[in-house]
Regions:
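Conserved Class I SAM-dependent methyltransferase catalytic core
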Residues: 47-102, 109, 114-117
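Conserved SAM-binding strand-loop segment of SAM-dependent methyltransferases
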Residues: 2-10
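C-terminal substrate-recognition regions of SAM-dependent nucleic acid methyltransferases
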Residues: 101-221
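Conserved proline-anchored active-site loop of SAM-dependent methyltransferases
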Residues: 9-13, 17-37, 55-62, 68-75, ...
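Short glycine/proline- and charge-enriched loop/turn segments
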Residues: 36-45
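Short catalytic/ligand-binding loop motif for oxyanion handling, primarily in non-cytosolic enzymes
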Residues: 14, 30-33, 77-80, 106-108, ...
Length: 221
């Protein structure tokens, strides 16, 4: 058995062959628009709607590997910028999703999961495991990746379906609050960010507070 180490930028390296397995933990961060590598990485990306570098790693791994297993931010399941990714992955066999919650990396409050993708098989059942809750399920991939829903609902069940029947969808656009950090906020900007103290106890009024009100610019989203 021979081990060949390749010390290079994975996203730029020209691989001459495909691999049986690609296993990894790519970096998670949004690249700045001023970064010259952003457009270079995007050239070969499947999902060109995002600037998050982890997406470029996933796209390249999918093109290179027969079987791909990656640790990934949990926002893969539900953020709009990853809708193109969910679309193409839905056509592949997602054999397992392990939900680590915030327990993936000690001291880091980022929810993560591991996704196992079989490029040589057709979609069937997906094993879903919640490390946080000790929950283990076998779900129909078609059921939890239902095209009628905007997100992947990996814990979907009959109770969820009953609630869905009573709701009107596509009324609001959602942005997960954990994607917004204090470093992105300022006292002026394009979009007002409402925090807990900005909302009255009865939920009917917006309260303006000096030295507390925050804004975020479009480019940070």
């Amino acid at each position: 058995c021979t081990i060949n180490y390749i010390h290079d930028d994975f996203l730029l390296h020209n691989f001459e062959e495909k691999y049986d397995y690609i296993i990894g933990n790519p970096p998670f961060f949004k690249m700045k628009s001023t970064n010259k590598l952003l457009n270079v990485y995007r050239c070969n990306a499947i999902n060109k709607a995002t600037t998050n570098i982890c997406s470029f790693f996933l796209d390249k791994a999918i093109n290179l590997g027969n079987y791909v297993a990656l640790v990934f931010p949990k926002f893969l399941l539900n953020t709009p910028e990853f809708a193109p990714t969910r679309s193409y992955l839905s056509e592949k066999a997602i054999e397992c999703i392990i939900d680590f919650g915030e327990n993936g990396f000690p001291g880091v409050l980022v929810e993560t999961l591991a996704v196992f993708i079989n490029n040589l098989s057709r979609p069937s059942n997906t094993r879903v495991a919640s490390i946080t809750h000790g929950k283990y399920l076998s779900q129909s991939q078609k059921y939890i990746f239902d095209e009628k829903l905007p997100y992947w609902i990996i814990y979907r069940d009959s109770r969820f379906d009953e609630v869905c029947k009573k709701l009107d969808f596509n009324v609001f656009k959602v942005f997960r609050d954990r994607q917004i950090t204090n470093s992105q906020l300022s006292d002026s900007g394009d979009i007002r960010v409402l925090k807990s103290r900005n909302i009255s106890d009865d939920g009917k009024k917006i309260i303006n507070l000096s030295d507390y009100d925050s804004y975020i610019n479009y480019e940070a989203l």
